[in-house]
Amino acid sequence: MKETVISIVGPTAVGKSLLGIEMAKRFNGEVISGDSTQVYKGMDIGTAKVTKEEMDGIMHHMIDIISPDESFSVADFQLHAKKCIDDVLGRGKLPILVGGSGLYIQAVLYNYNFSEQRRDESFTKKLEEIIEEEGPNQLYTRLKEVDPVQAAKVHPNNHRRLIRALEVYETTGMTMTEYQQQQQLESPYHLILIGLDMDRDVLYDRINQRVDHMIDTGLIEEVRDLIDRGYENCQSMHAIGYKEIIQHISGNQPMEYAIDALKQHSRKYAKRQLTWFRNKMNVQWYKMEPSIIDEKIEFILNDLAGILEEKSN
């Protein structure tokens, strides 16, 4: 019989972390972060990591495991997160994967086999040299020619994803979408997928308020510290919440412009997250309402209790 794994997904600022903690309390679980940026040490405010106080004694995994200058691919994330799931299950507890990084969560929950793809190190090195010497535009143009769907999802400055997409095409002859579809096999787990949504205007207000809170609690100081430690040009610093503040600190944008850009990018990201999870995964959706958040959480937990009881019978 497959072991049960729960995943809570949805857009940023919708309330996933709080539900995950309450769920872990109710069902003897532990939380595994499904956020691709929370793995980085020192990147706390901009990635909206839960604090020790907010964790309220619940064990959290996949947070603060590498430095901002270290490379951490989807395959790396999958390997580490699956080990966490095995560890939690091995101690008789319920793994609860919580986050909004769609591809990363999908890679963990399904049998993506990254090891089967042969990597041509010389080809990879050649692409890296082209970017270093000429910038990313030549490679981005090539990606638009061979895989326009993936090109629309990848920013030219995201060199790692740009190279990865071209690697897949070069070594398999498939687009990234085709490759991912081939890789998505049956899940090794009994999955319970819970999605949180919210009225768009309410969600966007929450996102704007979260950004203001990040600024008030020291995001600019956090980014300055990361720059002072030599991380400014690392891939991790291209994440939403960091690239915008870097533009301000470097003198390219006034503070209010940087904050507005951060809010706008976060809202657009939330929209992309919802699209991903609605199209890619068979999720049971629940609409959250901030004014009655406790009641909504209790409703979801009661629903889940029924599902788990039914499985055990």
Curated annotation (Swiss-Prot):
Transmembrane segments: none annotated. It catalyses: adenosine(37) in tRNA + dimethylallyl diphosphate = N(6)-dimethylallyladenosine(37) in tRNA + diphosphate. One of its GO terms (biological process) is tRNA modification. InterPro entries: Dimethylallyltransferase (IPR039657), IPT (IPR018022), P-loop_NTPase (IPR027417). Its EC number is 2.5.1.75. Disulfide bonds: none annotated. The keyword Transferase applies. Residues 35-38 are annotated as: Interaction with substrate tRNA. It comes from the Bacteria. ATP binds at G10, P11, T12, A13, V14, G15, K16, S17. Substrate binds at T12, A13, V14, G15, K16, S17. Its cofactor is Mg(2+). SUPFAM superfamilies: P-loop containing nucleoside triphosphate hydrolases. The record marks S101 as: Interaction with substrate tRNA. Keywords: ATP-binding, Magnesium, Nucleotide-binding, Transferase, tRNA processing. One of its GO terms (molecular function) is ATP binding. Belongs to the IPP transferase family. Catalyzes the transfer of a dimethylallyl group onto the adenine at position 37 in tRNAs that read codons beginning with uridine, leading to the formation of N6-(dimethylallyl)adenosine (i(6)A). Monomer. This is tRNA dimethylallyltransferase.
